[in-house]
UniProtKB/Swiss-Prot annotation:
Mg(2+) binds at T26. Residues 174-176 are annotated as: G5. The lineage of its organism: Bacteria, Bacillati, Bacillota, Bacillota incertae sedis, Caldicellulosiruptorales. It is found in: Cytoplasm. The gene is tuf. The keyword Metal-binding applies. This is Elongation factor Tu.
């Protein structure tokens, strides 16, 4: 059986379901595939297929995530759904599944619950830019005023965490009714809420800027000296494009970036005119000695990224079962922070009133590195100690 070819005809968007346990995230995910399958735009995935998601390892952390794909008339979607609450926390902080937008599922019968809040806060911290709400289980609420009340609560909660609560689309319905319906007609009344939701997702969550359209950045993995030609740095282009003859900055390990010109680009020993996001390339740098550039620095379009030493981050601390620490750590803890291609020592300051951090915790902290690194908001990192990963984090704010 030949593999189906991925046809890139529609814009692609990554989304996921978030929300409190038992509010219907997985039921909704299954219902979306069912209704879109009736329109010939998805393969139906039953609840059990999604719920028994295989374990994945991302940066040494075990995460259960279900990946589902489907299409609307407008776009192609990759949708992630996590069975357990801890899986969500890990998923969002490690960026195992980067989301361009999220569907927040809230039960109309219960209203917002603790994990509803936690997921909204996490989404904000790790830069999930847009949220669409599905108010589920409305068939279980007799009083329409109660539904209105829950809707107001959800809007207030979103506004509290920095989302435009008044503008966010809220679609009401019953995912279970849609999933259990026997109708083969995609326009049956019980499917309307699902079609309405996908229409809101199509319209409200913008197609993200592709990596190739962003400013050039390449983390340096290795440095070589080629006799008679100069210094070559190698790495995988993270974003943007680079043409021979363009000026770049070497950023990191020094207070100020250093400018140079890329005089040649090679891939698989062949000369390239242009490198694009995803390419593994070697770049020949003009006027740079081998000892003036090192792994852990980045090559970047001038003026687009600066070296920093101090930032705030949201961090998930691994449990001992995940290979993390067996004991808590305290204020002033000094592990290694692994950014892109290298480790840098840094000191942790916990928030006021927080004495220590236990394995399994999800915590906000301030970090001060001993040398400046090319950092920007949203950058992921691992916290390591003696070569093993003990935490995973995402930069939320740059301080200096």
């Amino acid at each position: 059986m030949a593999k189906a070819k991925f046809e890139r005809t529609k814009p692609h968007v990554n989304i996921g379901t978030i929300g409190h346990v038992d509010h219907g995230k997985t039921t909704l995910t299954a219902a979306i595939t069912k209704v879109l399958a009736l329109k010939g735009k998805a393969q139906f995935m039953a609840y059990d297929q999604i719920d028994k998601a295989p374990e994945e390892r991302e940066r040494g952390i075990t995460i259960n995530t279900a990946h589902v794909e489907y299409e609307t008339d407008a776009r192609h979607y990759a949708h992630v759904d996590c069975p357990g609450h801890a899986d969500y926390v890990k998923n969002m902080i490690t960026g195992a599944a980067q989301m361009d937008g999220a569907i927040l599922v809230v039960s109309a019968a219960d209203g917002p619950m603790p994990q509803t809040r936690e997921h909204i806060l996490l989404a904000r911290q790790v830069n999930v830019p847009y949220i669409v709400v599905f108010l589920n289980k409305v068939d279980m609420v007799d009083d329409p005023e109660l539904i209105e009340l829950v809707e107001m609560e959800v809007r207030e909660l979103l506004s509290k965490y920095g989302y435009p609560g008044d503008e966010v689309p809220i679609v009401k319905g019953s995912a279970l009714k849609a999933l259990e319906s026997t109708s083969q007609d995609p326009n049956a009344p019980e499917y309307q809420c699902i079609l309405e939701l996908m229409d809101a997702v199509d319209k409200y969550i913008p197609t993200p800027q592709r990596d190739i359209d962003k400013p050039f950045l390449m983390p340096i993995e290795d440095v070589f000296s080629i006799t008679g030609r100069g210094t070559v740095v190698t790495g995988r282009v993270e974003r943007g494009t680079l043409k021979t003859g363009e000026e770049v900055e070497i950023v990191g390990f020094a207070p100020e970036p250093r400018k140079t010109v890329v005089t040649g680009i090679e891939m698989f020993r062949k000369v390239l005119d242009e490198a694009v996001a995803g390419d593994n390339v070697g770049c020949l740098l003009r006027g740079i000695q081998k000892n003036e550039v090192e792994r852990g620095q980045v090559l970047a379009k001038p003026g687009t990224i600066k070296p920093h030493t101090k930032f705030k981050a949201q961090v998930y601390v691994l449990t001992k079962e995940e290979g993390g620490r067996h004991t808590p750590f305290f204020n002033g803890y000094r592990p290694q922070f692994y950014f892109r291609t290298t480790d840098v020592t840094g000191t942790i300051t916990l928030p006021e009133g927080v004495e220590m951090c236990m394995p399994g915790d999800n915590v906000e902290m301030t970090v001060e590195l001993i040398s400046p690194i090319a950092i920007e908001s949203g950058l992921r990192f691992a916290i390591r100690e003696g070569g093993r990963t003990v935490g995973a984090g995402s930069v939320t704010t740059i301080i200096e």
